[in-house]
Regions:
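Hydrophobic, aromatic-enriched interface-forming segments
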Residues: 147-198
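Histidine-centered active-site loop/cap adjacent to the catalytic His
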Residues: 260-292
Length: 292
């Protein structure tokens, strides 16, 4: 197996750009922090792209940066480099797009809190809105807010695929992945970055006993939304979702504030954790490309 060779946009645009013709598969990558830095400690840093392996040589130009959300991938003013490489004067013909989408969007959307915020703009309910305890962690979810979130994701994927289809790589396959289930805990990336999930659960007064179950439900709901979007081939042609929910990832311990299980911090995996997802995802991608 051959590891994915990852380049930055700056390398590709330099006076001596790398020759991409060696690769059987040439990807343009964009997304959130699962494609960039998982921690500020270089000895423990990895990402999903670094752990991908293919049967044939493959390379990717990675436009992602920490904190990216799906909207930024589609807004020219926020990420002109990605758009230029996809459909602008610097565009290449790509064999596929690699996308890490939805995770940071979910984290951002969970921050909305309080009865003063309409339910359609909140993913979680206020304490006095909670349903019956018999419903488990689902009693904390705002159905109206999740519908808004789904509409938001769909609009952004439609925009992104529109950018794809306006350039020389029109119709090329776009590949997105699911996420693993994090443990809400006080484990950031250093220098004040994170935790990301825990503060929102605390702000919503979610009982500690339900943190793990709610985190699992949030990831399951996000996976369902992404899977449904990819399944709608009419609105979102040649978009492929790799479901990671059945892959066994060693969970972190709730009270551990450092590396724990397959997690380097609250929402980012160790190199070993990423490899558990990246290797089968790469195999699925290669299967699509070989069948094209």
């Amino acid at each position: 197996m051959k590891p994915l060779t990852v380049y930055t946009p700056e390398q590709v645009s330099s006076s001596m750009p790398p020759d991409l013709s060696f690769a059987a598969y040439r990807f343009l990558a964009e997304g959130d922090s699962w494609f960039t830095l998982s921690t500020l400690n270089p000895a423990h840093n990895s990402n999903l792209l670094f752990e991908m392996q293919f049967e044939q040589f493959a390379c990717a130009v990675n436009c992602a940066y920490p904190g990216d959300t799906l909207a930024r991938m589609c807004e020219m003013n926020s990420d002109p480099v990605f758009v230029q490489l996809l459909r602008g004067r610097r565009a290449h013909i790509w064999d596929g797009l690699l996308l890490s989408c939805g995770g940071n969007d979910l984290v951002d959307a969970l921050k909305a809190v309080g009865n003063g915020v309409p339910r359609a703009q909140r993913l979680l309910l206020a304490r006095d809105e909670w349903g019956d305890a018999a419903h488990g962690p689902a009693r904390y979810l705002s159905p109206e807010g999740w519908q808004t979130f789904n509409t938001y994701l769909q609009a952004n994927f439609a925009h992104l695929l529109g950018l794809r289809d306006a350039g020389p790589s029109a119709g090329c396959p776009a590949f997105m992945h699911g996420y693993a289930c994090p443990t809400p805990r006080n484990a950031g990336a250093g220098f004040g970055l994170g935790p990301w999930l825990l503060p929102s659960l605390q702000a919503h007064d979610i009982p500690r006993a339900d943190w793990l179950a709610l985190a699992a439900l949030l990831m399951h709901e996000l996976g369902d939304l992404l899977e449904a979007i990819a399944a709608d081939g009419v609105r979102f042609p040649n978009l492929h979702f790799f479901d990671t929910r059945a892959i066994e990832i060693m969970p972190a311990t709730l009270d551990d504030e450092g590396e724990s299980g397959d997690w380097v911090n609250e929402i980012h995996l160790t190199a070993n954790g990423y490899a558990k997802l990246a290797v089968p995802w790469a195999a699925a991608i290669e299967g699509v490309l070989q069948g094209a």
